[in-house]
């Protein structure tokens, strides 16, 4: 418990405080404008009625602090310490979802829109964000109908001899074939940029003036093109829901249920709702403090920062967070709590989204709880298995063997907990030994990780026996085990299926499989988990096999690293064509040097090449060029067809 004596010498300056348990573990990190005043609010004589706060404070054995010069520094330090210690009562937001944006470089010849993940400072214009690649592609699809910009990279486009298929369906203006002038194309690109920024009136004015000018100059085909563009824009704008007066903003809504907080985020770009996200996390302190901590962590994950952030309730020290976000964004950022008007309506909409997401989550959890309870009954487990892990092995006759682990939490896949294993200690084709290695590495190396309630292995009694042996050897307790054997298919002489056996579930201590109806929800869950482990293992095995088969002949060549290797494969199209290329062709590839090309030829064809002649001299040393007539074909550069290449000894 925090006492007045603990904080007697605390300063009244900005800083960060760390609450620690009896074993010196940091359980909470907070920031404050006034350290002494803030920590005193948690002291033993507090009459805070919130049970969850009183419970956390009871666990505090000591409090440390770090002083900073400003509130902004305290905010940065708090975020750093949360990442370092991962305290139990802080938000540990680990967001692996990537935002997508549309990129257009107006300085490029015939600018093109492309989908990107990162937004570097390269002078190009970026539009978004979009929550998924699908959303970004849908925007592009609609945009091309209004603004027929080129689809392909410039080099590919300009190398064409005739217009592409997109031109035939009126979604490309074919600048590659000169079917549109540079000025007209620039107007298209500018219109697309304005449209993506939500400046629809400016787009309409731009094209209306160009339509009138073309009509006055009797360029009626151009005038008709601008007329069609205007109509397409008007139809699209009518379908869009304008949700704000103008500008870009992120709108947050909060829904609180006991110690769980649901936050909904709506992205407003150019006054239009472009997408949204939802976040759920455990939080046992004040809602305002949770929202402030969430904003700090969320925007620290390289999320796009708009000029305005709208929130449903005030947070402590918003000026410090505004200063920090402005510094990151390179522009002024404001945090506001709307009181009326369209912005307040948007905050209410975000709150409604948060509440709906919470209700859907509760419904899913209720359904999952029922399913896991039924699974526990069928398999005779002591309690419903909240965390289920499944392991699988993939190899070709013992070669390039790999293992996989997938994890399901409350009946749903948690891909952040997936693991891949490269088999190291088993050289022969022995699936049992490989499974033993994977399981041993999981419980030795990952002993700090949360134990599963149930482990499922892909296999019958044999694999289940390996799993039990490993658990016994490593003295792992409290973990249940099951084996899921694939159904067997009998086929006739023409490979037609004539009989399919049932999926079978085995448990320790039983010789026979547990009888489960093949369409039952518990069995279908186990099959889904097993199939996901198999998919993950096979995907990894293909990656390993691909690297071994395609990379071995180019790896280790002097002067050829990863970049040159990729450039060669891209330039020639395949490893086969690289091997068939002449020395001159290899030297002419992008980024290649003569020494690297010679080293590659020697590696691929098993013998040294003759040294190049000194400048001004032929291969004969007297200025002449070797030819078949003077009988020195052995000194010429061999042909790529294999006729004349030195044979490998």
Swiss-Prot record:
CDD domains (UniProt xref): GIY-YIG_UvrC_Cho
Q: Which SMART domains match?
A: GIYc (SM00465), HhH1 (SM00278)
One Pfam family assigned to this protein is UVR
Q: Where in the cell is it found?
A: Cytoplasm
Which stretches of sequence are listed as region Disordered? 603-649
Any single Gene Ontology cellular-component annotation: cytoplasm
Q: Where is the UVR domain?
A: 201-236
Keywords linked to the UniProt accession: Cytoplasm, DNA damage, DNA excision, DNA repair, Excision nuclease, SOS response
Predominant place of localization = cytoplasm
In terms of InterPro entries, this protein maps to: GIY-YIG_endonuc (IPR000305), GIY-YIG_endonuc_sf (IPR035901), GIY-YIG_UvrC_Cho (IPR047296), Hlx-hairpin-Hlx_DNA-bd_motif (IPR003583), RuvA_2-like (IPR010994), UVR_dom (IPR001943), UVR_dom_sf (IPR036876), UvrABC_protein_C (IPR050066)
The record's listing under Gene3D superfamilies reads:
5' to 3' exonuclease, C-terminal subdomain, GIY-YIG endonuclease, UvrC, RNAse H endonuclease domain
Q: Which GO terms describe its molecular function?
A: DNA binding; excinuclease ABC activity
GO biological process, any: nucleotide-excision repair
- GIY-YIG domain span: 12-91
The answer to whether the entry has keyword Nucleotide-binding is no
- Membrane-traversing stretches: none
Physiological role: The UvrABC repair system catalyzes the recognition and processing of DNA lesions. UvrC both incises the 5' and 3' sides of the lesion. The N-terminal half is responsible for the 3' incision and the C-terminal half is responsible for the 5' incision.
Family per record: Belongs to the UvrC family.
Its assembly, as annotated, is: Interacts with UvrB in an incision complex.
Q: What is this protein called?
A: UvrABC system protein C
């Amino acid at each position: 418990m925090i006492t007045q004596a603990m904080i007697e010498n605390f300063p009244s300056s900005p800083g960060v405080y760390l609450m620690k348990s009896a074993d010196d573990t940091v359980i909470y990190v907070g920031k404050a404008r006034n350290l002494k005043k803030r920590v005193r609010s948690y002291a033993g004589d507090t009459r805070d009625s919130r049970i969850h706060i009183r419970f956390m404070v009871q666990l505090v054995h000591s409090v440390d602090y770090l002083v900073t010069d400003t509130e902004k520094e305290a905010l940065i330090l708090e975020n750093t310490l949360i990442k370092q210690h991962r305290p139990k009562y802080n938000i540990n937001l680990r967001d692996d979802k990537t935002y997508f944006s549309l990129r257009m470089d107006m300085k490029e010849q015939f600018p093109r829109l492309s989908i990107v993940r990162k937004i570097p400072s390269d002078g190009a214009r970026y539009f978004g964000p979009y929550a998924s690649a699908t959303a970004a592609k849908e925007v592009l699809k609609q945009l091309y109908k209004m603004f027929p910009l080129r689809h392909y990279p410039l080099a590919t486009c300009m190398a064409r001899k005739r217009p592409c298929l997109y031109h035939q369906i009126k979604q490309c203006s074919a600048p590659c074939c000169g079917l549109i002038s540079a000025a007209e194309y620039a107007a298209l690109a500018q219109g697309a940029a304005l449209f993506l920024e939500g400046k629809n009136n400016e787009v309409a004015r731009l094209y209306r003036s160009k339509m009138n000018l073309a009509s006055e100059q009797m360029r009626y085909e151009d005038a008709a093109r601008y007329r069609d563009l205007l109509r397409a824009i008007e139809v699209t704008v009518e379908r869009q829901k304008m949700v704000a007066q103008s500008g870009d903003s992120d709108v947050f809504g909060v829904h609180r249920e006991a110690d769980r907080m649901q936050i909904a985020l709506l992205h407003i770009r150019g006054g239009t709702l472009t997408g949204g996200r939802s976040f759920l996390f455990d939080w046992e302190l004040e809602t305002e403090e949770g929202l402030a901590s969430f904003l700090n962590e969320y925007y620290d994950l390289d999320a796009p920062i708009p000029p305005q952030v709208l929130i449903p309730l005030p947070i402590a020290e918003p000026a410090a967070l505004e200063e920090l976000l402005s510094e990151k964004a390179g522009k002024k950022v404001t945090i506001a709590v709307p009181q009326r008007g369209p912005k307040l309506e948007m905050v209410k909409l975000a709150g409604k989204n948060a509440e709906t997401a919470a209700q859907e989550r509760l419904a899913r959890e209720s359904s999952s709880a029922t399913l896991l309870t039924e699974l526990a009954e069928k398999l005779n487990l002591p309690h419903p298995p909240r965390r289920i892990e499944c392991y699988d092995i993939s190899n070709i006759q013992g070669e390039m063997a790999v293992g996989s682990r997938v994890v399901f939490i409350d009946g749903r896949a948690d891909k952040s907990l997936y693991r891949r294993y490269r088999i190291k200690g088993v050289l022969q084709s022995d699936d049992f030994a490989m499974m033993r290695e994977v399981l041993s590495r999981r419980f030795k190396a990952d002993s700090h990780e949360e134990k599963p309630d149930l482990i499922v292995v892909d296999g019958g009694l044999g694999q289940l026996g390996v799993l039990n042996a490993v658990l016994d050897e490593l003295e792992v307790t409290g973990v249940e085990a099951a084996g899921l054997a694939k159904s067997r298919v009998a086929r006739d002489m023409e490979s037609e299926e004539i009989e399919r056996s049932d999926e079978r579930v085995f448990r320790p201590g039983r010789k026979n499989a547990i009888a489960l109806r093949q369409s039952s929800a518990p069995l279908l869950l186990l099959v889904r988990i097993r199939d996901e482990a198999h998919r993950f293992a096979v995907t990894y095995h293909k990656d390993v096999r691909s690297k071994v088969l395609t990379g071995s002949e180019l790896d280790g060549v002097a002067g050829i690293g990863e970049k040159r290797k990729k450039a060669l494969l891209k330039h020639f199209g395949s490893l086969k064509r690289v091997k068939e290329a002449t020395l001159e062709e290899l030297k002419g590839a992008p980024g290649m040097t003569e020494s690297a090309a010679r080293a590659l030829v020697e590696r691929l064809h098993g013998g040294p090449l003759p040294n190049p002649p000194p400048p001004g001299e032929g291969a004969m040393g007297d200025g002449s060029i070797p030819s078949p007539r003077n009988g020195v074909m052995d000194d010429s550069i061999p042909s790529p067809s294999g006729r004349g290449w030195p044979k490998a000894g």
